[in-house]
């Protein structure tokens, strides 16, 4: 999927929200998507759609009355609850995010693709976010920032998993153990 130069962008997501650090309005550790308005004008998102399925761009329709402030942020909980927005704007999509490489988050309006991201796996409590906000550069954020500027240190990827030269087990005598990693591209 390719994106057009959108006013509103998918700016951050967490598909591994756990541990109680960021709870939704029902007290659950729901995953979430943050949208960012790159303009100096409020944007009415009522009728826009969010999806995790390229074959169904209209999987979740954002309720009428939901706007995103100029240069502002909007978090949509991906809880699977599909609840309409409450009085303070907590919005729950009717699907959940998964921790599978290759899954998508897609933002569209009237069937026209506005933005999309092919998700990457993250560790528990981490998120992926654009840094700086709205840019083309995605980073691992070890301190997620829903509804706020993506601040703090961002990492392009996780360190590769080390490999030992000997399999696990019990050995007699002295053994020389070496660790190695394959650098990521």
Ranges and model annotations:
Residues 4-184:
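Intrinsically disordered, low-complexity linkers and terminal tails enriched in Ser/Thr/Pro/Gly
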């Amino acid at each position: 999927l390719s994106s057009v130069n959108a006013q509103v962008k998918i700016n951050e997501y967490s598909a591994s929200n756990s541990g109680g650090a960021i709870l939704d309005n029902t007290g659950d550790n729901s995953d979430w998507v943050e949208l960012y308005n790159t303009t100096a004008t409020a944007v009415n998102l009522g009728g826009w759609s969010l999806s995790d399925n390229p074959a169904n761009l209209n999987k979740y329709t954002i309720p009428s009355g939901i706007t995103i402030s100029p240069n502002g942020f909007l978090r949509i909980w991906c809880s699977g609850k599909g609840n309409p927005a409450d009085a303070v704007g907590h919005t729950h999509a009717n699907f959940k995010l998964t921790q599978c490489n290759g899954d998508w988050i897609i933002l569209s309006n009237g069937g026209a693709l506005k933005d999309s991201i092919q998700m990457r796996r993250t560790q528990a409590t981490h998120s992926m976010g654009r840094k700086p906000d709205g840019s083309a550069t995605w980073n691992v954020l070890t301190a997620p920032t829903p509804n706020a500027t993506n601040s703090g240190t961002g990492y392009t990827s996780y360190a590769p998993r080390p490999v030992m030269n000997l399999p696990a087990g019990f050995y007699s005598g002295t053994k020389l153990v070496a660790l190695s990693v394959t650098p990521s591209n």
